[in-house]
Amino acid sequence: MATIQSETDCYDIIEVLGKGTFGEVAKGWRRSTGEMVAIKILKNDAYRSRIIKNELKLLRCVRGLDPDEAHVIRFLEFFHDALKFYLVFELLEQNLFEFQKENNFAPLPARHIRTVTLQVLRALARLKELAIIHADLKPENIMLVDQTRCPFRVKVIDFGSASIFSEVRYVKEPYIQSRFYRAPEILLGLPFCEKVDVWSLGCVMAELHLGWPLYPGNNEYDQVRYICETQGLPKPHLLHAARKAHHFFKRNPHPDATNPWQLKSSADYLAETKVRPLERRKYMLKSLDQIETVNGGGAVSRLSFPDREALAEHADLKSMVELIKRMLTWESHERISPSAALRHPFVSMQQLRSAHEATRYYQLSLRGCRLSLQVDGKPPPPVIASAEDGPPYYRLAEEEETAGLGGVTGSGSFFREDKAPGMQRAIDQLDDLSLQEARRGLWSDTRADMVSDMLVPLKVASTSHRVPDSGPEPILAFYGSRLTGRHKARKAPAGSKSDSNFSNLIRLSQASPEDAGPCRGSGWEEGEGRTTSTEPSVIPQREGDGPGIKDRPMDAERPGPELFDPSSCPGEWLSEPEWTLEGIRGSRAQGLPAHHPHPHGPPRTTSFLQHVGGHH
């Protein structure tokens, strides 16, 4: 067993858990504390020295935050010898992508998506206070801490691509964001700010619900095309100012057209670049509103007498889609800020409480958020908003009547305990939560069964009666799953996740917009800074059905290295055993593989550590 030593500590290397393009990650035992840690090991040379310099600078800035309260990974120390660099981090369990893959990419209920979103928004709000743009937010960079002890408690990792806003705003060609989660201002070459992270988070939220990336573009043209087909064309003034607009758009030949720009056709793009556009979406949405109709979300609208639990879940899903729409806007100044998003009814659960407080769904949602924010059984410290953000931006609905300025009661209780009758019983059943409670039957063995389960909504109440469907349905464009189906699984390339050589990122050359003065609104949006635009506020929507598919889609790959030929970067949808759920008991546990908790041992780390190792 090898041993490495810093100036202040000594580490015993237990095993190497992952190797990447620029280094490896090992699980080590820290002698001074007796804790297991993750050690990223890189070669000590001039090239890697330049790469690691930025990450170290950002890690030291973030080190001033409380990593548990700010939901960022704990950085322990950095040291080096003549041959290697060493970065030591706390040991986390697995990232959201690996969690999805373990669970066959089944859709995550809205209440769990809220729990994750709340924590990531808190992290982004803290990073904004330090003027830091994470610039690579995606499921791989959101880590579950310990799913057995703290369900859906997460932390943001990987600051190798992060930037300090004041330093990057005038840089000619910074590298930021992975393609699936890349903001429009980065795609088009427009001024950008920290709201690029908000766009990425909106894409992650949609992906957790869909079980598939919302915009899985094979290249930047496909990425822009997918966004346009769902959200409409960007406003003309954006394209007039965009440095890269001519890559994806052309002038409209019709002088009377409302928009002087039009998206280049697939044939135009093929003729110009010799690259054939691909169709890799699972759902071809004609608007973001259609997100709520996917995976059984539209079942309630087709039932005459849905029960109150189904109504509560449907209302929550609808509220989540409203927040996603505020996050995914073409114009960054119209996009919701992290602090304002923390006041959104979906995150605060205000509407859910007012209309569905007596439901088990609400109580479980509240309990899940509460547990994710507590550390060692203690409530989180108060979050005080800056003057420009208006009122305190974090407050769950249950706190409204008892919370002070910081969102904590005077007695120190984080939530009121005088709960409605039966609530405690519901809380006690948290361990019995299932990721597919409202979507049983997703564990089909065949592709046809999986597609059928996703298309046929669950019968919510046995006494319900179906009524004719209302409203358009999204087009199911990809039949199969990320793990099974007719497409051959391919091995993921080394370092294909988030390499710190920025190989999966892009260049752009723009200045950042000046900060706009706050424009006070009302309700939960009070305090969100906005700017006004002389252009119409409504983004034109594409009409008609989605484009016909000429090529069968390939498995939706994670964004691969941009500096290489895309055809040489295979996808990562690898086969895994059937997924296991935490805490399933009774008859629902029958037929599911056994899960081995680890209350007395180190959590699973392979996925996270391989990712960290692949970063360099």
Swiss-Prot record:
What does the record say about tissue specificity?
Expressed at moderate levels in lung and white adipose tissues and weakly in brain and liver.
Q: Record keywords: Transmembrane included? A: no
Q: Which PROSITE patterns match?
A: PROTEIN_KINASE_ATP (PS00107), PROTEIN_KINASE_DOM (PS50011), PROTEIN_KINASE_ST (PS00108)
Q: Which gene encodes it?
A: Hipk4
| SUPFAM superfamilies with a match to the protein in the record | Protein kinase-like (PK-like) (SSF56112)
Enzyme Commission code: 2.7.11.1
Organism placement in taxonomy: Eukaryota, Metazoa, Chordata, Craniata, Vertebrata
Can you say what this protein is called? Homeodomain-interacting protein kinase 4
Subcellular location field = Cytoplasm
Q: Where is the composition biased (Basic and acidic residues)?
A: 542-560
The organism encoding this protein is Mus musculus
Reaction equation(s) it catalyzes: L-seryl-[protein] + ATP = O-phospho-L-seryl-[protein] + ADP + H(+); L-threonyl-[protein] + ATP = O-phospho-L-threonyl-[protein] + ADP + H(+)
Q: Which residues bind ATP?
A: L17, G18, K19, G20, T21, F22, G23, E24, V25, K40
- A GO CC annotation given for this chain: nucleus
Which residues are annotated as modified residue Phosphoserine in the UniProt record? S512
Keywords of the record: ATP-binding, Cytoplasm, Kinase, Nucleotide-binding, Phosphoprotein, Serine/threonine-protein kinase, Transferase
Active site (UniProt)? D136
Briefly state the protein's biological role. May act as a corepressor of transcription factors (Potential).
